Structure formats: structure tokens, C-alpha cells
């Protein structure tokens, strides 16, 4: 069986295409992509079938076969993972356009349409669903074969979670944010939830990312004095709340992104690789700079966001003691 697994895996891997065409997401699925989809499904079918057989074997046999099963699973992921990465990059690119919008206007006419960047994101998700996910995701009847989540279902779930968190991250960085801007942002969040839920993955099943989206929407409408005691902040990463508070502070209270002259994309890449307590260190440095500016002028009054941000950040410090 072990030799057979090796031969079958090697033969199928050689058939996988890896060129640029496999990552295209702008047009219909190409014949090369469709062939890769078939290979993914075939390899996953082999993995599922053999896994069910191995479950009944002695543990010594399981130990021997496990590395080869892992190799089959990795091979099954290879034909589709670049496609999902390309789509994730596309959706992130759409979301980054939030920083090109004017959310600080006070007298803009409110309409029922989503922002232009959100409309582009919706179109992209709908196209991906129609041209790719319709071929990749299992039917409802086979959605959980042997209780195992399919590779493409897992990749779709991960992408949906990433889109929600990435959106909240960048929405929290928007500055300035007027009352009209809050309404526009809330509308965009509703459209995002609908697009992801209908075309990618049921948002209610995404757990923490979904709870964070649902918490951030009403959070932006709270008075600053209400935020410290609001249960909404329990469903949000502290960095999201802290970044949002910058928009409520004076211009001289610069965010780490502003202080370090980073683009939203650069700062986001940095955030991807940091823990919450590490992000707090960067935020604390800007609060210290702000305090120095205030004291150097002889002022004694700080913006209300200053003690609130220190309060939220101190909880991160205590958690890591």
C-alpha cells in the first residue's frame, strides 16, 4: 500500500499546472484551472478513502502511513491554493481603497448605494463564486463527507474570515470619520456581511471574525465616554478599538502608521506579524509622544481618548505579565 501511495501521489503531482494561468481570477475558469480542480478533488477523494481505511488499522500501521497521507493532502491543496491566494489579494486590494474615500465629510448627501470600493469587492466576490467556487465547493449532499471539511471549503472559510478581519482593521484606521462617514461605513459593513455570507461562507459560522464585525458597527456610534465600559469591546481585538480611538483624538495624536510614515498596506503587513501586546507597544509610543507635546506647552488637559487608550492597553500589559 505504501508503494502504491507513493506512485499515485507522484503521478498526480506531475499533472498539476503551476503557471500564472492557474492564478487568474478576472475571467472564466480556464481549461488548465479546471484540470487542476479535478486533480484536487481526485486527490482529496483518495485521501478521504484511505483515511477511513487507516482508521481501522493498528496504530503501528497508522504511524507508517500517516506521512504519505499528509503528502497526498498537501498535493491536493497545491492545485487550488494559489487561486485562493490570488483572490484574497484581490479582495484585500479592494478593501485598501477605503483609505481613498472621504469618510470625513460633514454634509455629503447620503444615498442607498455602497461605496465604490465596496461595490468592486461585491462584484469580485460574485464573480469568484460564479466562475470558481461553483466548481470547487461540494454540493450540500456531500458537504461533509465522512465528517471532514473539504479543502476548498476550508480555504473559502479562511478567506471569508480574513476578509472580515481585514476590513475591520482598515475601517478602524480611517481618519477623519464624521457622523456621515460613520453612516456610510455602517452601510458598507452591512453590504460586506451580505456579500460574504451569500457568496463565500455563512458568516454566522465564522466565529470571532463575525462577532468582531457585528461589534464594530455599533461601536463607531458610541460616545467616547461609553466605550470603556461597553461589552462590544470584548468581541474586538484591542488593537482595533485602539486604532479607532485615534480618529476621535486630536490631530497631534498620531497613529503608529502616521508616525512612521507608512502606507496602509505597509502598516497592515506589519500588523499581520505582530501580537496584540506588540502592537500596543507601538501605540503606547505615540501616546507618550502626545503626552510630551501637551506637557511641553504647559497644558494639563488631555484628550478623553488618552486615558481610555491607556486603560485598554494596560489590560494587554497585565495579560502578558
Predicted features by range, described:
Residues 1-321:
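Extended alpha-helical "rod" scaffolds
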